[in-house]
């Protein structure tokens, strides 16, 4: 047998005592674990699972007991007599044949149809106006060409080598500076700082 089947055979009192015992063991194991004295930490998980099974069995029994109690509720004599009389009336009266009931229902419907046609009016339907928003499209701006053109400057490099017994002279290179035109800089505006003079 499994553990759950064995536990279901026990009475409620035995299960309550088992719950108290398991809660005590669980507290003891957790205390030992906190102090580092617990050698088998898997015992905590086993106790928790067993405790869950026992509590589940107890709640099932409690719910079943409440359902059974509500199901077989005793009724008073007056309510019993009313129920019995209503069933007797339903059984004693014979329903009319199906064809007779259909014919009776059809006649009033035919008479009521012309009246309903005269009373109906057509509803006027107005078309909905859709609001359209006008969007202004700005023309694309083409980039303007630069007013100042860049000037190309050629640089000449001359190298002279002289072989002499005198100390060596460094080679002379003449490089002309290239002129490059960049965007004109914006003039910097100086801001004046106003200071309040103390009144005397």
From Swiss-Prot:
Residues 92-200 are annotated as: Disordered. GO terms for molecular function: structural constituent of ribosome. Disulfide bonds: none annotated. It holds the Pfam family Ribosomal_L29. It comes from the Bacteria. Residues 108-200 are annotated as: Unknown. The keyword Ribonucleoprotein applies. PROSITE patterns: RIBOSOMAL_L29. GO terms for cellular component: cytosolic large ribosomal subunit. Residues 93-179 have a biased composition (Basic and acidic residues). Residues 1-107 are annotated as: Large ribosomal subunit protein uL29. One of its GO terms (biological process) is translation. Keywords: Ribonucleoprotein, Ribosomal protein. CDD domains: Ribosomal_L29_HIP. InterPro entries: Ribosomal_protein_uL29, Ribosomal_uL29, Ribosomal_uL29_CS, Ribosomal_uL29_sf. The keyword Ribosomal protein applies. Residues 186-200 have a biased composition (Basic residues). Belongs to the universal ribosomal protein uL29 family. NCBIfam families: L29. This is Large ribosomal subunit protein uL29. It comes from Mycoplasma genitalium (strain ATCC 33530 / DSM 19775 / NCTC 10195 / G37) (Mycoplasmoides genitalium). The lineage of its organism: Bacteria, Bacillati, Mycoplasmatota, Mycoplasmoidales, Mycoplasmoidaceae.
